[in-house]
Every structure is written in C-alpha cells, then in structure tokens.
Amino acid sequence: MRLPRIVVAGAGMAGLVTAVAAQESGAEVVLLEKGPAPGGSLALSGGTLWCARTVDDLRRLVPRGDVELGRVLVEDFPAGVEWLVALGVSLAPLKTLPDRTVYLMEPGPGAFITHMAERFQSGGGTLLCNSAATELLWSDEGEVSGVCVRINGEARQSIACDRVILTTGGFQANPEMLSRYFGRWSDRLILRSNPRSTGDGWQMAQALNAAPSRAMGSFYGHLLPAPPAQVPTHDFIAYTQYHSEQGVLVNLRGERFTDESLGDETNTQAVARQPEALAVLLYDDTVYRTYAVRLAGGGARASDTFYESQALGAPAAVACSLEELAAAMQAHDLHGSSLLATLREYNQAVQDQRTAGLVIPRRANPNPVSKPPFYALGVTPGITFTLGGLRINTDGQVLDRGGYPIPGLYAAGADAGGIHNERYAGGLCLGLVFGRRAAKHAASH
C-alpha cells in the first residue's frame, strides 16, 4: 500500500508540529518554508505555550470564539503537551492560573524549532526552505492533487501529493488584506511577527471556493511605543505595553474609547480604530512601579517599558501634576484640556466606586491616576497574527462556502480562523492542537 504524500506549507509552530505528526502517522511529508530557515513567527516569540484550563474558562476569556473548535482546543491541549515532551521537547510549567495553564519552551523557541526540524528530517521528511507555495493543483476527480512552489523567488515547480495542509501563518504582513479587514488606519499597524506571513494559504484556498471564518476583522497583538520610535524587531517583548489594562487610554481628542481592563490585546484592536491608530497610555507611580517596570522572566529580559520607550523617541511625558502632564502632551498633538477633564472624571468615578457606570465603562482594575509622578506614553498597535482565516472543522479540513470539506485541503495555526475572536487565549496552542488533528486526519483518510 502506497504511503499518503502530504505537503505542509509553512514551517512555523503549526507547520513543524503538523509535519512531525503526519510523519508519525505514516505519511511521506514534504515541508515547505518560504523563508531561509524554519521558525516563522515562533522564532520571534517568547516561546510561551498556554491555553485555557477548561472549556468554561475559554468561554469567559473568548466569549465570541467558535464554540466547537474551542472545545477541541481545550480538550486536546494536555495531550499535545504530553506529545511534545515525549518527543524530547523541554517545556517548563511557567505558572498555573485559575483559568489557564502556561508552559515555557526551554531554553527558548530556537531550541524547539531546531529540535522539531531535526526530528522531522531524521525521520525521512523533506524540508525545502526558500520555497513558497503559490497555487493548489486540482485533479479531475475533484480533490487537491498538488501544489505549485516558487523556489528562491524565481523557479517554479509542481509537487504532486494527496493532501495539502496550510500553515502559512495568517495575513498580518499583507497590506491589501489588512486594509480590507481592518480599515483606514491599517497601514499604521506595526508588524511584530514574521514578515513573510502574507496570507499565502488564504489566497491559494480562495481559488477553491474556501469559506472565510468568523473574526476576519480581529487580530492578536499588543501596544507598542508610537512613532517616531522604532522598536528593534529582535526586542519587541521588552517594549510591549502589556500593562495597558492597568492604565487609562485616551485618543488624540483626550477621550477614553474602550474598557482598558478587557486586556492589552483588546486595547490594541481598539487603538487601531482610533484616528491615526494612536493613543496615549496614562498611569501613576503605583502602576509604573508595579507593572511598567518588569523583571526578566518568561523568555524576556528585564525592561522599563516607559523610559526605554521614551528613549526610542516615543511621545512621552512625566509630571508631578495632572495639569502639567496634560500641558506637556499638548506638544504631541493631544488635546490637553480634554485629557485633564477625562482624568478628573475617571479619578472621581474610581473614588466613588462607579467606574462601571462611566460612558465608557471600566469593569475591572479601576486604578486611580492619583500618585505622582504621572506618566503619559504615546502608543500604537502591533499586530502578531490575524484571528480570522479559513473556516475549518474539528479535523482541520478547510470548508467551502457551502460548509463542505474541500477534499484534500487542511489548515492549522493562524491560517485557520475563528477559534479566537476579538479576545485571545493563546496562539501557539492553535498550531499544536489543530496541526496534530489535521495531520492525523490527512494521513488516515
């Protein structure tokens, strides 16, 4: 009996997992990587692998995500972690919170990438770098029969196969698609991931009438210091404003526009919809010392996210009074009088314990901006990966616009969308769980 031949397009987290899992399931596997080496956006991450602890936890964290895909994500995650450990991957339990379980790749994502790539190749797999999948081939029998590949940006060749699994990493580096789904200010988004994630999987699948998932207008990312600051691509984590949920965000009019306590990834999407995709993050000395100054840990270096961002050139001010802070930020095109009124109204609501009743409610973390000195930092969205993509079923099969599986076509990782929507509960877990599921189904059907 001939072994099934599977082509996996993209060698990031999802692609590496998929390729090794398909190989273990008895398939002959070719793994394509658009760049010069495997890794994708995983290589730029901190290597944190996490997921919601229970299905109920996931529903609270991501209430608008796909229910059935979310259930599979949570239920399969522990087995995926056990599988990685059995392969020899070093995962350290980083912390266990009431609603999530977190692991850290040790000594970092680079070791994971090397280990998985070597495991794949030593098992007889073919890894082709500088090889971008550009087109899916379709047989007379009505199923995927191969893929066209551009090698080194020039030569093209076709690879015949029985199944194709798309793991190209989303479309966050595709300006046209960002404009289509994220609107007027999408060109201001700072790419904090793989620059080769240009929606290749999405575009190839559209030729086969593939359906879009939900969440096409959502992305996962974090706030970064605003221009003229330019964050070094190797050091995104040190400058990321994870603590925005502890502060107050205002737009250039000096007005709040979102419930900051929903989380930095939600704040990032909200800022992307504001004029110029710019906002100012405000907090007092208590928040600065507790959250803005970070110790080394979780794969990241120690950093002072305010002063290091200011040193890069981001609009910023420190003052001993709110009046002085508002006046200082006027030099950065912020409406100072509106900012002052916003902060006074907010502080009064905190004092009266009625922040949930503000025009823009604040439901958690009602930290007052009351202890000097006070800090203001211009911020802008950084995009890591898109939450929308191809619609899949629980086996990772790509569905057409009628809701039927496209024979021979699968997707995992950021190419498969709708699992998260607006909010987020782990990124690498998507590649782990649905990469394994797609591999198993593709190798056995």
Model-predicted segments: where are they?
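Glycine-rich loop(s) and the adjacent beta-strand/alpha-helix scaffold that form part
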Residues: 159-228, 428
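Internal hydrophobic alpha-helix adjacent to the cofactor/substrate pocket in enzyme cavities
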Residues: 204-211, 431-445
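N-terminal Rossmann-like FAD-binding beta1-loop-alpha1 element of flavoenzymes
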Residues: 4-31
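An anion/pyrophosphate-binding glycine-rich loop and adjacent beta-alpha core
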Residues: 202-204, 211-334
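A glycine-rich dinucleotide-binding beta-alpha-beta segment and adjacent secondary-structure elements
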Residues: 135, 338-419
